[in-house]
Amino acid sequence: DSPAAATLKGDPRMATLLHRAVWSHVGTADEPLVVPRGAHRWRVAAYLVQEVLDELAGRGVRYGAARAMLPQRLAHLVLLGMERAGGSPDDRVQDAVARSSAVQRYAAQLWPPVEPRAMLAGLLSDGDLLARHAGDLFAPEEQQILLWDKPPRSRGSARWSAADAVLLDELADLLERTPSLGHVVLDEAQDLSPMHLRAVGRRCSTGSATVLGDIAQGTTPWATSSWTESLTHLGKPEAHVEVLDRGFRVPAEVIGYAARLLPHMAPGLGIPRSVRDNPGELVVQRCAATE
């Protein structure tokens, strides 16, 4: 990736883009569900199926979890029809209907599986597909930067960058929830992008975290500019921030000289202090631009 592409891939807008792309796969119920069972053909109106689709999509569960629920929800609608016809179906009948080829095929058409690598490869190689989901998020010139210069011959042959790996992780979590650890320790946090931080945050969504870093020393173009921003993307906006502004390694005279850059590099950060004072150790020497 170029620095510009990596920066855009680390932008939090990518989370919205990927969410849209995944959930766009959910179809619309235009045809009724028809389930043959014995001598009967049980019919569920399309509008009832659509209500189930809307309810599952609005539950806030992962795409894959909702997809797994759909056959049982459809089978339940079939059972309601059986009961209205005077039958007394039980849970075993519902399970059998949910496993039937008619329900499985119908559910797969409305809620197809999504594979993260295929999804991302499509977005990065198809300008029309990218624009469909990114049109109001990324400017046309930004979309052009995101697109691969030379799309792979097949999606299986795609070569993923480090920035792509984080997007694949985001996609995987949209499909199935990432398990949370009890505690995560993160060092050098100042160099991470918002999407990096989201990936770490998923690993401690129900746990805790210790995050270390110096915002003023961020070395990447995609780095965040404040602890407030970093912790928000990490999913811990209310976390306690302990400022460690005393050090021994660098003499006070050097710190004082370097701190002149703070207002430009990290506005709002306080000046660090050194417990070691060595007057006269810092010598500033003017030199030519070519030296």
PLM feature spans:
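P-loop NTPase motor core
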Residues: 2-33
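Phosphate/oxyanion-binding active-site loops and adjacent basic polyanion-contact surfaces
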Residues: 14, 70, 163, 167, ...
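Conserved helicase motor core of SF1/SF2 NTP-dependent helicases
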Residues: 1-6, 169-183, 190-291
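Conserved helicase NTPase catalytic core signature
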Residues: 28-183, 192-197
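Generic recognition of well-ordered alpha-helical segments
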Residues: 17, 106, 257-260
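Hydrophobic alpha-helical scaffolding
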Residues: 4-12, 60, 64, 93, ...
